[in-house]
Amino acid sequence: MMKTEKSIEETLQEEFFREKAVVLCRATEKLEISLRRLTILGDHITEFHFAEKEINSGCNVINTDLKQLNEEIDAFNKVREEVKLCYYYLIVTREALGLRRHHWIEECYQIPPKREKYEQNL
């Protein structure tokens, strides 16, 4: 005899697994979005830095440009802290759902180091 209807337990278990997947997806997506923002800011800082070096060719960078570059670095470091928090939330979420191995998370979602501000001479 073939069973056609699911039991209440089976239905609840399926719903529970779907909810787990949604929660993990949401936490991972937040981390990925924050990392993307961080990458864009990092690339912008690097481009700005090299453009200024090329334009000034060894001369001192104008203070307003240096101020702008340091503001970009502040923004980068702020987003980096957000990334660290999202990473932490993902790990905590995984732990709460019974997932204990996180080595692939560490490999996939590497957080770049904090950037230091520049002084007068680049």
Name these PLM-found stretches.
Residues I8, S34, I62-D65, T93:
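Terminal low-complexity, poorly structured segments
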Residues M1-F16:
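Short, charge-rich amphipathic alpha-helices with coiled-coil/heptad character
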Residues R36, I40-D43, E47, Y88, ...:
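Generic surface-pattern signal
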Residues L12-R36:
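Short, charge/polar-rich alpha-helical segments
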Residues C59, I73-L122:
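Amphipathic alpha-helical packing elements
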Residues E15, E19-V23, E71-E82:
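Conserved aromatic-histidine-acidic binding/catalytic patches
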Residues L41-F76:
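Mixed-charge, low-complexity intrinsically disordered segments
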Residues L31, I40-H44, T93:
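Intrinsic-disorder/low-complexity detector
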